[in-house]
Amino acid sequence: MKKKAIISACLLGLDCRYDGGNNYVGDEKIKKLKENYELIPVCPEAYGGLTTPRVPSEIAGDKVVSRLGVDVTHEFGKGADAALYLAKLFDCDCAILKANSPSCGSGTVYDGTFSGTLTEGYGVTARLLTENGIRVIDENEI
């Protein structure tokens, strides 16, 4: 029986990015992942009630704010809770998440200035999963 992993839906080609697009990682990476894992797609931002497309958001201090200055911390937290629920429901030991995202970034995220600058940190979902013992990697580590 294969292990199970949640994966950012945008990495599988689902159009759920903030701009309505996706971050498809390509057939070779997906094939490699499917050799070892049953993949469960998740989009924490959609699960949190945010629309697609949506105004970009970044982590600023202890909050997540949109480029328009709207506090969307609650929505990001709700989406993270949903992703954790699914990871536990399917007994996932790994999560493959979108690099640099305010939800899914693992190690680096955008710094909250909307200038494209990266800083050390974890997205809301990546942090919650890690705190609950689920290993998080990004698409660059496949």
Language-model segment annotations:
Residues M1-I6:
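Extreme N-terminal starter segment of soluble prokaryotic enzymes
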Residues C10, K98-S101, E141:
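Short, well-ordered beta-to-alpha junction loops that form the rim of enzyme active sites
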Residues G13-D19:
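Short N-terminal binding/cap micro-motifs at the start of the first secondary-structure element
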Residues G20-N23, Y110-G116:
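Short glycine-enriched, charge-decorated loop/helix-capping segments at active-site entrances
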Residues N23-V65:
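Short, surface-exposed acidic-centric catalytic microdomains
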Residues V25-L39, G79-C94:
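Short amphipathic alpha-helices and their capping/turn segments at secondary-structure boundaries
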Residues Y47, P56-L86, T117-I142:
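Divalent-metal-activated hydrolytic enzyme cores
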Residues K98-T113:
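Internal, conserved structured core segments that host functional sites
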